[in-house]
Design a protein with these regions (language model features):
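Metal-dependent active-site segment of extracytoplasmic phospho-/sulfohydrolases and closely related
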Residues: 83-124, 166
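Active-site-proximal alpha/beta segments of enzymes that process anionic O-linked groups
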Residues: 1-52, 162-164, 181-187
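Extracytoplasmic/secreted proteins, especially bacterial periplasmic and envelope-associated proteins
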Residues: 20-21, 41-45, 76-79, 83-90, ...
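Polar, surface-exposed loop/tail segments
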Residues: 157, 172-189
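Substrate-binding rim/cap in mid-to-C-terminal beta-strand-loop elements of soluble/periplasmic
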Residues: 125-170
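Active-site His/acidic residue clusters
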Residues: 46-90
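Solvent-exposed loop/turn segments at secondary-structure junctions
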Residues: 1, 7-8, 64-68, 113-116, ...
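Loop/turn elements at helix/coil->beta-strand transitions in domains of secreted/extracellular proteins
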Residues: 52-58, 100-106, 134-136, 143
Length: 189
């Protein structure tokens, strides 16, 4: 399994010119945040990995929207969301147009927290005191998952269930010293 995040260099695809360039650019282009890289880097690194290594599952978590929200830059927050839509569409369109991947690859996209959405001035924040910040969105699309579109009025799903869901999708026996949730039943056909 490959995990890569933040300002961490991507060492998996040695010799891939685009990945090597991104690794250099991550350290040469100033990022306004201490431990977060631009989402474009995450997208291109993951897309190159997907094409080269053919994983059965790709988990994506982008950070740009969170950082722009904390900074109060609503315009950049919206631009970032729009770019993410394009990145996700590019990956999924490529997966579906490639017979080696179509109906074989699962994509999971989520975030680690929600945002304050009840009181306008709190949209920049999250945490236990901010109403709405415990609610996150989760997108799972793949061959094992029914195509249901947006699900509303269902039993709650929790972030603690994602690890066990990934383990089942990959047919891996997952153990953790900390308590984890059960698999998300609605993900499976």
């Amino acid at each position: 399994f490959v995990v890569n995040s933040g300002q961490e260099e991507f060492h998996v695809l040695k010799g891939n010119r685009q990945v090597e360039l991104i690794n250099k650019l991550m350290y040469k282009i100033p990022v306004p945040w201490a431990s977060v890289r631009f989402d474009a880097f995450t997208f291109y690194l993951s897309f190159n990995y997907l094409k080269a290594k053919k994983p059965r599952l790709l988990y994506l978590a982008f950070d740009g929207t969170d950082e722009y929200a904390h900074d109060g830059q609503y315009d950049q927050y919206l631009y970032s969301m729009n770019r993410l839509d394009g990145y996700i569409k590019s990956i999924w369109d490529w997966v579906q147009s490639n017979s080696g991947y179509r109906n074989k690859t699962t994509m999971i996209i989520t975030t680690d927290h929600g945002r304050g959405d009840k009181i306008l001035k709190e949209w920049r924040s999250h945490g236990s005191s901010i109403k709405g910040s415990k609610k996150v969105w989760l997108a799972i699309i793949g061959p094992d998952t029914p195509s249901t579109g947006e699900i509303e009025n269902s039993d709650p799903v929790y972030s603690t269930q994602i690890a066990m869901t990934i383990a089942r999708l990959l047919d891996v026996d997952y153990k953790n010293k900390k308590e984890v949730g059960t698999e998300i039943k609605s993900v499976f056909k």
